[in-house]
Structures are given as C-alpha cells and as structure tokens.
C-alpha cells in the first residue's frame, strides 16, 4: 500500500510539472482579481511619495515596461518609434551569431538612423551617428555598437510619451497591478502542495503549484517548534535575509532563488526555484565519478553562482555536491543558504559547514574569515566529483575530528592521472594560507576564471547557459529519493514545545515578496488573460454605473478618492462600502449606487483623526472624532488595501491640519479687524472655499 501511495504521489507531481510547462495559466485554480481602477488615486500618491513615479523606475519593472509598450503601440495619438528602436537594439545585443548581428546592424541603421537623418527631425546627436558609422565602415559590429543611442532614446521616451502614459488607462492598469503586488499576503491556501522532495534539520521541501498562476515552485517549510527546540531562530531569519539578498536585483541563473516568504502559526515557508534534476551527490552515486571535462562544466557554473554571492558580501559556507541541484536540462543551481552569512560589516568566526569541505580558517576557533573560505570548499567539491570522496576523507572515515585534523595539517597528494592544469588549480584552491589561495589574492572569482584550467571558456556563454551539460537527468522521473525513504520527523520530539506570543513576534517581519520575480511570474502566466478579463468587466461596470465618481478628479481640488468601508448600518455594526472623496474642507462619502446625496463631514467638525490605526472587528481602522451635536462622536473607516488605508490616513490628517491652521489664521485676522470681543457661540465655517460664520445651533 505504501508503494502504491508513493507511485501515485510521483505521478501526480510529474503530471503537474508537465502541464505547468505547457500552459501554466490553464493550471491556475484560483482567479486573480485586480482592484478597482479608482485605486489609481491612492497609488499615484504612494508612488510619488516613494520616489517611484518616474520613467526609469516604471520602465525597468517587468509589468511597467509591458504596459508602457502597450500604450506606445496601441493608445498613443502619435507613433512612438523610439521604443521599437530600443527593442531592436536589445535584440541585437542578445544575438550570438556574428553574421546575424551584421545583418541586424544594417537593418537597424537603415530603418531607424538613416530614416531619421533623411527626415531631418534631428532627434539624435551627431556623436551617436558618427560612433555607429565608424564601426560599420570597418565592417565591425560589437555588441555595444548602438549604446550611444540608448540614453538619447530614454531622454525622448521620458518626455512627452511618458507624461501621456501617466494620464492614460494603461497607467491606471499599472497602478492596479502594483497595488495587487503590494497587498500580497500568502497562506497555504495559495498553493497546491505535492510530494516531499527533501528534508533538512528544521523541516521538509515539497513540490508545489501557485494557485493563481499555475507556476511550479519548491516550498521549503521549517517547523517553528523544531526551530525553538534547537534554538535556531536566528539561523532561520538569516536564511530568509540571505535569500532576499541573492534573489533581488540582477537574476543569477546559478542560485536557487526565492520569490516569496510567508509564515503560518506553525511553519516558516520559503517559495523557491524548483529543480527537478536531483543533486550532484545523487548523480555521483548513479553516474559514477566525472571526467575533467564534465567536472569543468559544473565548476564554471558554480563559479558564477559564488561570484554572485561574493559581490553581495555573502560567504556561502556549505559548498558540497549535495547542495548543487540540477534542472531538467542539466544546468546547476547552488541551493540551501541556511549557513550563508553577510560579512560586509563583521566577518564571521563560527566553525560551521560540512566536515571535509570546511576551510582551515573556518575550523580554527576564533579566526575570522570571509568569502575566501568558499574557494577552499570549491576545491574540495571538485576533488570529490573527480574521485568520489573529499580530499581529507581518506579510507571512507566518518570520524569528524580526524577529517578536521587532516584538513588542518595534510598536504593533498593529487593523482598522476590529473592534468597539469587541474593539479595546479586544485593545489591553489586547497592552499591553507589564505593569502596564497586562488580567489583570495585581490580579484576574487576573476582569478579562478582566468586560471589555465578554464582556458578557452567563454564566460558569457556560461552565463547564458549555452554550453551542453554532460548529464541530462532522466525525464519522466522525480530524480529524488522515494517519499518514504526521505521519511518524516518524529512528532514526539516537539510535543512539549509551546509557541508563545514572543516566539511569534520574532517572525512578524518574515513575510516577503520579491517584486521583480513576482512580476516575471505574472508576465509569463496570467498577465494577458487577466488584463483581457478585467477590461471586459470594467467596460460592463461603466455602462451600468450612473455616476462616474472619478470624473471630476482633474478639474477639482479633490485630494484623494476611492472605495473605503465605513462602520454603520443597523446598530452601527456593519461595514458599508462607500466611494470617498477628500477635499481640503470636507470628506464626501457616496453610496455605491451614487443615487443618494453624499454624507458630508466638514473639517471644522473634526476634533481629531487617529495618528495610529485602531483595531476594530479585527481590522486596522482610521478613527475620526467629530463634534456636530448629532453624531455619536466617532466615524470608523477601513480598507482591505493596506497601501490605500495608509494613504487615506495620511491624507485625512494632512487635510485636517491644513484646515485647522487656516481656521486659526482666519480667526486671528477677524480678531484684528473686529476687535477681541466677539460672540463665543460663533465659529468660523469653511464651505466650498467661502467663509461665513455659524452659531452653535447651526444657524447663520
């Protein structure tokens, strides 16, 4: 029965993998809904405040670029050739074949540069033209041939085209997607979890599928009780921070990166790149030892993975074949950053890692070290791929003390079968003296890449994964140990462990979404489908809606507008959806239908607006205290959109302060004009920009 369950788990997992490769969007079991277009008002203020409402920020975001491109191609009143020019340059730069690049260079020159010169529009500088012509006349087409044009293209795009984009529906759609991204709060319900594929000290790794996009990931779940039992809280939080550091910015194809982190009451969850090809330790046992050329392929890709970490001042500290995972095509990624450490501010000195791979300085108590330790481990790993064991684990000994002693004292004897270049590489990597070790003499990974063993390697070709892997994992197999062989934790171990509020507080900042990776996921799966469906829904809504709430946004002094929830209804216990409009002197709360007159709250009636959110019905809320003689003195507002709620709170308090300052200023002026004696029952009243007075009973 257990065997049958294992087979069924494997079949289910493999079927999910195959379907996600073809049409991941079709595998989405949960619909992704964009917020109402009115969120534009809130997001405009948010992006402006965060310094993200500029051309380069939006243009360099995956979804921002796609929507700006859509605007240029389909919505702009005038043709925008600069974007097509830009895309052709980028395509040219990615073209590997020199002959193809020559043809593309000529086409780009004829269609964009020559055409612009003949039209006498003078959009580009003479310097840019001369630079390109100089190379073309010599029949040369370097990759950066058109680079002088890029900055000039950006200068033109960020002018009128970008300003028009900010006024368009495509920018509204960008605001909707950005708002959705910023409000991501993941739970286990957002994933379909498949079979277990690995286990570590604190938890397990499963294959999983993201419900709203259909994309397959690996889910690493750490048990909070087991972490507490082993006092591993800082290790778990450190792993999250290291994954964030290597996963943000320029993507590295040779590290298992993270897209999301979230937690439940019991688990810490990392959503990571899924690698289906097994690890090098597994393949070493199946395939046998590797040849020098085969090892060279893996070494080159690992070097680029380490280089990515080291540039971010991260020392990996656990390099070994078991942590090198293969994808379905045979390319590698370095996995498991549980022991990785940031050395930018303080160098570590803890003896952590795997015996037989740890550098001498890591084993020496109290000795600080940095990324140099990884190059020693790298040498140990290469030796194992070639010989089947660590250079310091002779005769299959498992005695950790003996292995450590040999690491600190033994000179490794390299087999005669090794080439001279390989011998020299390993001798330099396995130097106990850090100052003489390859990779540690001032130039880091470049020193290793320039070694004679790697002579002839085109490192750009390595980066774009153009070299053929020596081993392609079998398709239609899980390439991992059987689910029952992997086993499970003994629940009795943590039976007496209780998690309290202080334990949970440690993880309150744990949840995270890596923006560029989420946007890439969306663009590859459901972006077009969701946009099409949302366009249809919004068109229907516009036809039904009697009042267009945002119609007066440009023409009036409206500060902020959008949907918000107000506590009211029967017994003042229900949330009512309102369309709110904030003006300098008042807040208008319109019913959803727009049929009735809005509820008006004037700023001179407001006594106080809470500076912090109050908790009401388990919701973060804005509390407005008013004094008009007819209310209970409180108005409670909330919004499921965290970004929106913060902007409403900030804008309301700002409008109230300005109103109070204006009232105070006008009262002083009135005192100077009419004298200090006045009717204390009268107060200044601002309405629609006009000033009058009203008595305490409301009469004028």
UniProtKB/Swiss-Prot annotation:
<feature type="domain" description="RGS">
    <location>
        <begin position="54"/>
        <end position="175"/>
    </location>
</feature>
<feature type="domain" description="PH">
    <location>
        <begin position="557"/>
        <end position="657"/>
    </location>
</feature>
<dbReference type="InterPro" id="IPR000719">
    <property type="entry name" value="Prot_kinase_dom"/>
</dbReference>
<dbReference type="InterPro" id="IPR016137">
    <property type="entry name" value="RGS"/>
</dbReference>
<feature type="region of interest" description="N-terminal">
    <location>
        <begin position="1"/>
        <end position="190"/>
    </location>
</feature>
<dbReference type="InterPro" id="IPR036305">
    <property type="entry name" value="RGS_sf"/>
</dbReference>
<dbReference type="Pfam" id="PF00069">
    <property type="entry name" value="Pkinase"/>
</dbReference>
<dbReference type="InterPro" id="IPR011993">
    <property type="entry name" value="PH-like_dom_sf"/>
</dbReference>
<dbReference type="GO" id="GO:0007186">
    <property type="term" value="P:G protein-coupled receptor signaling pathway"/>
</dbReference>
<dbReference type="Pfam" id="PF00169">
    <property type="entry name" value="PH"/>
</dbReference>
<dbReference type="GO" id="GO:0001664">
    <property type="term" value="F:G protein-coupled receptor binding"/>
</dbReference>
<feature type="binding site">
    <location>
        <begin position="197"/>
        <end position="205"/>
    </location>
    <ligand>
        <name>ATP</name>
    </ligand>
</feature>
<dbReference type="InterPro" id="IPR044926">
    <property type="entry name" value="RGS_subdomain_2"/>
</dbReference>
<comment type="function">
    <text>Specifically phosphorylates the activated forms of G protein-coupled receptors.</text>
</comment>
<feature type="active site" description="Proton acceptor">
    <location>
        <position position="318"/>
    </location>
</feature>
<keyword id="KW-0547">Nucleotide-binding</keyword>
<dbReference type="GO" id="GO:0005886">
    <property type="term" value="C:plasma membrane"/>
</dbReference>
<dbReference type="InterPro" id="IPR011009">
    <property type="entry name" value="Kinase-like_dom_sf"/>
</dbReference>
<dbReference type="Pfam" id="PF00615">
    <property type="entry name" value="RGS"/>
</dbReference>
<keyword id="KW-0418">Kinase</keyword>
<dbReference type="InterPro" id="IPR017441">
    <property type="entry name" value="Protein_kinase_ATP_BS"/>
</dbReference>
<dbReference type="GO" id="GO:0045880">
    <property type="term" value="P:positive regulation of smoothened signaling pathway"/>
</dbReference>
<dbReference type="InterPro" id="IPR008271">
    <property type="entry name" value="Ser/Thr_kinase_AS"/>
</dbReference>
<feature type="binding site">
    <location>
        <position position="220"/>
    </location>
    <ligand>
        <name>ATP</name>
    </ligand>
</feature>
<dbReference type="InterPro" id="IPR001849">
    <property type="entry name" value="PH_domain"/>
</dbReference>
<dbReference type="InterPro" id="IPR000239">
    <property type="entry name" value="GPCR_kinase"/>
</dbReference>
<comment type="similarity">
    <text>Belongs to the protein kinase superfamily. AGC Ser/Thr protein kinase family. GPRK subfamily.</text>
</comment>
<feature type="domain" description="AGC-kinase C-terminal">
    <location>
        <begin position="455"/>
        <end position="522"/>
    </location>
</feature>
<keyword id="KW-0723">Serine/threonine-protein kinase</keyword>
<dbReference type="GO" id="GO:0009966">
    <property type="term" value="P:regulation of signal transduction"/>
</dbReference>
<dbReference type="GO" id="GO:0050254">
    <property type="term" value="F:rhodopsin kinase activity"/>
</dbReference>
<dbReference type="GO" id="GO:0007603">
    <property type="term" value="P:phototransduction, visible light"/>
</dbReference>
<feature type="domain" description="Protein kinase">
    <location>
        <begin position="191"/>
        <end position="454"/>
    </location>
</feature>
<dbReference type="GO" id="GO:0005524">
    <property type="term" value="F:ATP binding"/>
</dbReference>
<dbReference type="GO" id="GO:0016060">
    <property type="term" value="P:negative regulation of phospholipase C-activating phototransduction signaling pathway"/>
</dbReference>
<keyword id="KW-0067">ATP-binding</keyword>
<dbReference type="GO" id="GO:0005737">
    <property type="term" value="C:cytoplasm"/>
</dbReference>
<keyword id="KW-0808">Transferase</keyword>
<dbReference type="InterPro" id="IPR000961">
    <property type="entry name" value="AGC-kinase_C"/>
</dbReference>
<protein>
    <recommendedName>
        <fullName>G protein-coupled receptor kinase 1</fullName>
        <ecNumber>2.7.11.16</ecNumber>
    </recommendedName>
</protein>
<keyword id="KW-0597">Phosphoprotein</keyword>
<dbReference type="GO" id="GO:0035091">
    <property type="term" value="F:phosphatidylinositol binding"/>
</dbReference>
